[in-house]
């Protein structure tokens, strides 16, 4: 998993740094040296390179020391490429074998990466040091992430299980398995830590009363259980001496609602006895080291060496302080809710256990009775346990036992007393542990919420092999066998059964990991009974011992394959069991006692009656334990049926543990298990050391390789059809029609739409199965799709909201218009008199109704007040009743609680008594029945014994000698028959193996035939060689960059070191301050807690009062709101009345005015006025009275209302103040409490963190110092590597020769196969000769056996005669002696025959063993080939997936290409349109220029007329005489001239306006032209960029074509070397390829030249553009300045025409200056000087204009000055003419230059375009030519590859046939080995073998003929291929002439098909290349 940037310190232990993985040196070594793994005695496996192959042996050179070693081919294992170094999931390894897995684990372990995925489970190697990968930051990193998104970690396993539990609603379990010391307990703690953070129940919850308490207690349960249940062993400093299953319950939302812990088999014997260098349970050492003085005195504690039960005294644990751990344990007990009294009681029991070990007994002198000379330790024990010393001593030394109906005292021996004390200590500690566990479970399950599902975590003692292995080790190893069996069954059996159940094509694989035999050896109840059943059976026998148990075990299970008796017996109680992790030697001493676990009833009854309540509670259920005292009543003889225990009978430890384990396994089977395989790296507990053989043994035992293999080959991810459709239908929305219901068909349609590779999935009956990684890919696609959908939805929502807001604004606009219209209407209406009258009269109509409304309101108000009083009285009564009822309810609840507790206790007592009674009754009945059976059996046996004794006495004397001889012969016969039977069984076994091998051979043949079709795809791997050169070059650059980075990092590390030193000193000071603050805060916290309790009590009372007050307030607020509404209505009525009053007053005033106005009209009007005034006065009086009465009423109501409101507000304020005070006190207290707790927690954490940081900084400082030195060394090494890599790049070419050597090797293999064929024929002949020899020997043996059989028959007949004639033995004594002598001679001959027979049997067995060894070797080679075949299948699947991905890329690229073509056509259309528009604009500009020239010509004509008029005026002035003409004529002429001058001015102004319009049009055209030019330049630039991009693409394509051509050439060379027969045919292709390469190189050179020319043109074009842009900028500036000057000159023109001409001349000069600036940048300085001159000239003209204005004003007054003015004007006119002529000539010259530059620019642009187009066309033509060459070469290569494939196929078929013959020969060997059976069977087999050999020879001859035919067809095909190539070169003919042979015709047809495939592949090939 590549990480960006620099990895942090904690991430270094999680992520793999990819910069150090892709080493070019390692890659080169792997490719060049053919690196493999070979076995090593030290490292397990070593890297080596293959140097030479010698048949079945290979010579390799070790990489480490260069030593050459010869090893077998079967012992070599393939090495993975370097890119798979430190791979996170070992299922990704291409070569899966033990060496690769071990190497990967070793590399990751040495890099600090302890977690590694192994398929579906995780492997963790114990680092034996602290790693920074368990912080809160790491927890946040893994929270909610998918497994493939993060590196391997225990957090990832926990999160996966947690998410699966929530998503699938299935219970989960996490099983941490492994040997002792592998790290199971630590990983269990990390899982709980992660779940406590992720599934915290107080997040987002309202019930903050138990904020985080449950999670805190869950985390603190581990320290308590570890203190009381863990101990230091040889392998592990913190070994769990009990097993536990932690069940964490979750609700539906995923929050923790409770937990429960179950424990298994506490090793209580450790409390009294420990092995060397081991400790007892941690709590004993914690207590002695951590207890303070007062506690030491209370608990009577002593030193470590004063306790007998501490066998080794004080044994320290590295990096752990016992006193600190004691404090942590006490704190954990406090958090779990243990009171101080309970803690003290627990520690008292611990101390009493230690004191029990100090009680010493001695044997009295004359008797065996034990005595206690010193009872000091006993007094301490009794003081701690609260019992009487005398009673305790009596119970131990002289306990009371029941004999019959009497109770007597029995004196105990020293050994019995010691055993009783030790048993009491063990039982006490076990009961204490159980009590602690129940107390922890009670604390963890106090929420009483129902859990929807649970997640179980199993932490159980790992597999143990010690020097002395006892009963505890057997139980632990038995548990591990069951767990490993569960793993095997889940991973291998259930997985494959589900494949078959779902109908998936799957060949069942037997991984050979069945552990059932070993489990049955331990747990089987009968037929024959297992270890536990035999142990329980022996416990029933009173005289049974451990030796008798072992003897019976050897008798029953002696032949079991997993049971062994040690060869060298140290003790008769030893036996061995072969577990999955190895052979374990068990010592069965004291097993019967441990299994029965007896106790002294006298002591237990004492403890039950202890004065210490805690001790009595521990022993309260002592009566339920049925001791073994009843066993003494049994008779001496017992039946074997006693092993069957019935319900209610005595339950042994083994039975209880077996049942408990069965329940655990049932629970685990009902969950979905997640396995974590913990690996122990070494037994020295050293970090950084890895014992290869130890790790390999654990990997083999744990089934790691098999788990990876089934994960790779199988389909581990599966999902139900409906869920798959529901979850991933979004990815194929249109694939399923609406209303489609069939789930399976829907999934098939979705899969087709998703275009998944068929090899990646399988569709079953109810589920769809996927390979690893496919579902993760689909999840990523789904997330992307959902993101797009959400974005589209958000866009639609925003659009809807925008439209809605727009509609709302439109409605507001219409409303505003309506309001405006109404306001305008009102403004028009308000001044209308009738409207004013209407508004004044209308309110008066409602005055009469106000009195009635007021009266009704008063009545209503009175009723409301009465209801309020009544409600208040009822409220008080209800409050009183409520308080009474609540008190009664509390009393009833207390009584009910007491009753329920009493009932529960009574029920529990009743159940216990009933169970006890039932047990005792059943035992009694069983004993009585067995006693009767035993008595009957005893009587029968006695009678039979007497009869047998009599018979034996009769026969003993007669048959002593004959019986001895007969037994001897019988033994020999039995042994011979057993050997023959064994040989027959071996023959049957070999037959089965032969059949099995033949089936496997068929399977392998089918697989190999499938693989041969896909061999062409495998050949593509050779292409990787050509890419190595590029990779090495990139590696060199990367190494240089890394070197620089290393130097920077070294400097940063030095800075960091200095910074760390300063921080360390600061942290020391902070630690001291924090410790002081912690002490102060603890004091404050205690005080605040007391205050908080008191405040909470007050708060509860006040909350009840507050609730009542709030109810009153709500009711009063309702009344207030009603009154407020009434008051508002009254106020509104009053306002209306006042308004009416004002309106009436205004109306009265209006009427007065009207009356005053109309007073003088008529008398009738006066009368009306008087009447109106009277009415008005009456109305006024009435109105005043009403207002007064109304005001009085309102005043009264206001007073009443204010009184009520004030009372209510006072009450409300009081309640509010009380509530505010309470809330304030509550908040302050809660805040202070939370702050103090937070500060305390933070300070504690800070202290720990500071200490941790201190240690970490010290470590980092050392590491930094070492890194600095390492960095210097690495820098030097990197410099050397850079030089080496440059040399190694050159060595890559050597790899090509190796690849060519592979092809040559194929030819050699063909020759070797021919030689092997001859060898097999010779072997076959030898086998037949050996078979004949064996058959002759067997015939001889059979004859001898028949003779022996006849002799045996004769002896049997003689024996029968002897038995019939026993009575006549005395008479025939002499005859019998003779017969006996003959018999002795025959016995000797039989002895000699037996010896010969035995020798021959030994020779046959030796041959059998040799054959068996050969068979094992073949089996090994078969397994290796099977593994390689599996790896090839996996690689084939990967290649297919790559091909499908490339096809998808090809389709995408075709789409992109079509889009690019559309865009290019679009751009071409736009370019044409822009050129057309530019042409139109140019024509418009030319027409405007012509119009401008016409306007200038008109202007020039006007100037000429003006000049003529001036000349006439001069003539007139010159023609006047001195006295001349009179003034009247002069004035007349003056007026005429002035009128003419005015007319000329108007004409001039009109012309100027026209000129101005034309100039404006010209400016607009220039601006438009400028914009068009800018747009055209942008388009041109965009096209240039596009062309540049296309050029780059073409260059890339050319480069890729070069690489492809190089690949094709190399492959062609390889093919030519592989098949020498085709060399002549392929020479033409090589020549063509060389010519193509030369053409390509010439094209590349031409392309480089064109590129250089293009760059030159581009530079020139860019320079021209830059100069043009600068000219345009200066021109714009000058235009702006010119416009300002034009404005000034316009004002001057109005005053004087002469100044106008000067302005125009200056303007012309300005325009000429601008054009001169546009033409050349070199004349910029001259133009600036010219501009300054013109500005000076303009200023001068302005001064002259002022003077001329003064002259014009003076000319009206003084005519005399006209002559001077005319002369002055004529002079100025002459000068102006000369300057105008100069400017005109300069302007024309600049215009010519501008036109020339424009034409040059256009010519250059046209030339550049034409050159660019021509270069593009040339390049495209070259590319097309090269593509055609590549296509032609590809077609030729495909044809050659096709022919090569067909020859390879034929060759492989021949190889397979040869292999079949070899296998058949081996089969004959095996059949020859079966010659140990009967002679007839051997003869029949020999005849069958001869027939089979003849048939094989016929087949071989037939195969030889077929081989000859195949070679002839190959030659014919070669000729036809040459003909086809010649036809393909011509390319005219499309059909081929068939040859004579049918094989030739098939080749031609295949060639046709291959041509089509070649065309299709070429098209795909070109598409993919262009896409790249």
Curated annotation (Swiss-Prot):
Bias-annotated ranges (Basic and acidic residues): 1789-1802, 1866-1876
Cellular compartment(s): Melanosome; Cytoplasm, Myofibril
InterPro entries: IQ_motif_EF-hand-BS, Kinesin_motor_dom_sf, Myosin_head_motor_dom-like, Myosin_N, Myosin_S1_N, Myosin_tail, P-loop_NTPase
Disulfide bonding pattern of the chain: none
UniProt region (Disordered), positions on chain: 1744-1802, 1866-1972
C-terminal, as annotated region: 1935-1972
SUPFAM superfamilies, alphabetized: Myosin rod fragments, P-loop containing nucleoside triphosphate hydrolases
Biological process (GO), any one: skeletal muscle myosin thick filament assembly
Annotated positions of the Phosphoserine modification: 8, 23, 40, 1684, 1722, 1954, 1971
Domain IQ: from-to ranges: 785-807
Any coiled-coil regions, as ranges: 844-1934
Protein name: Myosin-11
